Amino acid sequence: MEDDDFSIKDKKENYETCSTETISSYISINEKCQLIEKDINDDNHENPYMIFNKISSSLIAMLQGVEVLCNLSIIYLLKDNYHLHPASLSIVMCFIKIPWSIKLVWAVISDNYPIFGYRRKYYLLLGSFLCILSLICLGLITHNNLFITILLLFIYFFGSSLCNVIGEAQVVESNRNCSINSSARNVSLFFAFRKLSFAIMSYLSGYLLLLISKKHIFLIGSFLPICVFTSGFFIIEKRNYTKSSIKDQIKCIYSIIKLSYLKNFIIFIFIMMSTPSCGNTLFFYITNELKFSPNLLGKMAMFQSLASFISIISYMLFFTKIDIRKLLLYSTIIITPFCLLPLVVIKKVNYFLFIPNTLFFITDTVLIEFIAEFQTMPILVLCSRLIPEGFESTIYSLLLSSNNFASIISSFLSSLLTYSLNITSTNFTNLPYMIIICCLTNIIPIFFLYILPNHSQKKNLQHSNSHTQKYYSYPSTDYISSQKSDSSEITKFSADMQIDDITLE
């Protein structure tokens, strides 16, 4: 499809123009529903996506960089101040990131319970305020109580996850009237800003640890949440969203995710991200055994983030049209051998190749990160186009929550594997076996690629039109009603507009 997905003005067919209330009534009677097409007046076309919204979403994208800035400080704090072992560290890191695994809860709340008539603004202010409060407290208290430290970290990750829900909803809303290329550009730019902040913060995280204390880094990290908090006051958003009952919302969510293409994406994302990893265990090996300095670790993380950034830009420019099955298959096949490369350092084979440990680890992590980013971007782009209007936070957060929940499962499996192999902060005898096991489990997602749609299966999604339509109109009575909306819109429905026009290119 060469024309924009939502622009079909040049078609010869007649459209019946009606209000959103009429559409809702029509849907309740007629099971052969058609997809809604919204034609926004030119003079208001820029209103939902004003520059302030773009600045806000960009700052939210960069907010996760604060986590990267403080990540080494957090790990060293738990490792040195509280003397946690690798398995215990993995469990603590899992616990404090639980808010990210249940982002769906925050999304449902923000979609259904607007604060003072706004679904985005005040939730963003609340989340950024919690980030500011927790980071300032972490920078001021004396760290001699593990419970208080974990609680403050938990509050920070809760605030950042809430901000992230709002930022992702803004990105999805900006994709509402875009072609597949524009959607790929919007999503790619959002994550490119995130990875760029990762690269900057990764370098600073190691460099600053050599100059200042961990508590000072927490205080410095509060600057970006302050910027996000300030930007929240300038968000352009329509008011008068009515409250929807949680029961009705859950019914709608359940009916939406029963659609095969959404359900299969959730299953595949979970399988792909739930395999065990040896990342935290390798951290203990390279710090305790290889004596890597914090500055070097920061540089490694910086190169890793730069690789992700370049990968995202490359995907945006060259790979948006590649079939998702082929992309995931080839990337998995390519990345699997690189997962075994740490064995070369552990067995000291690299000395025979005259490659130092530092260069070897940096090269390995950069290559893995570059290829791995190709596995996530097409899924994120496609998911952002499958989401019905009014469910921007809920469904996108559901899809990404499966990613975060799978990461927690991965951490628990990694902890269990670390414990069963008797790997400690000083005993790395069985580390090669753990690396091999983790590498083999990376192949598992290949066997589930068949559940994802390919180009030849696009037309098979057309039967989902009648099921999807009512969720496109579910919140529209109050969201785009001519009586309650701040913008002037014309709502139309088209009998020949197909589901693949908005989901797959």
UniProtKB/Swiss-Prot annotation:
Cross-referenced InterPro entries, in alphabetical order? BT1 (IPR039309), MFS_trans_sf (IPR036259)
Main localisation, per the record?
membrane
GO CC entries: plasma membrane
* GO molecular function annotations of the record: folic acid transmembrane transporter activity
Q: Where in the cell is it found?
A: Cell membrane
> What membrane topology was assigned to this protein in its record?
Multi-pass membrane protein
Sugar attachment sites are N177, N181, N186, N240, N427, N454
Which reaction is the catalytic activity of this chain?
folate(in) + H(+)(in) = folate(out) + H(+)(out)
- Pfam families to which the protein is assigned, alphabetical: BT1
- TM helices/strands, residue ranges: 58-78, 89-109, 122-142, 146-166, 192-212, 216-236, 266-286, 300-320, 326-346, 352-372, 405-425, 431-451
What keywords does the record list, in alphabetical order? Cell membrane, Glycoprotein, Membrane, Transmembrane, Transmembrane helix, Transport
Question: How's its activity regulated?
Answer: Transport of folates is inhibited by probenecid and methotrexate.
Magnesium listed as a keyword: no
Briefly state the protein's biological role: Folate transporter with broad substrate specificity. Transports folic acid, folinic acid, pteroic acid, dihydropteroic acid, the folate precursor p-amino benzoic acid (pABA) and the human folate catabolite pABA monoglutamate.
In which family does this protein belong, per the annotation?
Answer: Belongs to the major facilitator superfamily. Folate-biopterin transporter (TC 2.A.71) family.
- Name by which UniProt lists this protein: Folate transporter 1
The lineage, from the top, is: Eukaryota, Sar, Alveolata, Apicomplexa, Aconoidasida
